[in-house]
Amino acid sequence: MRVLAIDWGEKYIGLAISDPLRIIAQGLDVWEIKDEEDFVNRLKKLIKEYNVSEIVLGYPISLRGHENEKTKKIEYVAERIKTVVNLPIKFVDERFTTMEAERVLLEGDIKRRDRKLLKNKQAAVIILQKYLDSLSLDTKI
């Protein structure tokens, strides 16, 4: 069973998926946001295709740790997802993930126009890896 991460941007949604053992995150796709119905239908198909058992959403709290309009939007997205799929949804603090994603893409020598599109996918990878790492810290050997 895999974990799916979603980085909800202004125009694009970045997606990342874990391996079946929930150790490694990898970028999956970038979707342009058209409308809610399109998003929900594509999400249901993706969940089935990858055997997803849990969803992680980047949670955009302010630098001081306060909620804002973006956090309300993500909470709404989570509630919308819950109406169509019966999976646990977790929030992960996404502060600085966009900056880190841009740095990774710059270091990878990705062209500027491609970076703009790939930024959300890379941010989703970072969010998911943070979550997976937190799971491994909870596991006792």
Curated annotation (Swiss-Prot):
Q: Which GO terms describe its cellular component?
A: cytoplasm
The enzyme's first-digit EC class, named in words, is: hydrolase
UniProtKB keywords? Cytoplasm, Hydrolase, Nuclease, Ribosome biogenesis
Q: Where does the protein end up?
A: Cytoplasm
Q: Which GO terms describe its molecular function?
A: nuclease activity
SMART domains named in the record: YqgFc
Q: What is its main location?
A: cytoplasm
Q: Does the keyword field hold Hydrolase?
A: yes
- GO biological process annotation, one example: rRNA 5'-end processing
Q: What is its EC number?
A: 3.1.-.-
Which superkingdom does the taxonomy of this entry point to? Bacteria
Keyword Iron found = no
Q: What this chain does, per the record?
A: Could be a nuclease involved in processing of the 5'-end of pre-16S rRNA.
Family per similarity comment: Belongs to the YqgF nuclease family.
What name does UniProt use for this protein? Putative pre-16S rRNA nuclease
Q: Which organism is it from?
A: Dictyoglomus turgidum (strain DSM 6724 / Z-1310)
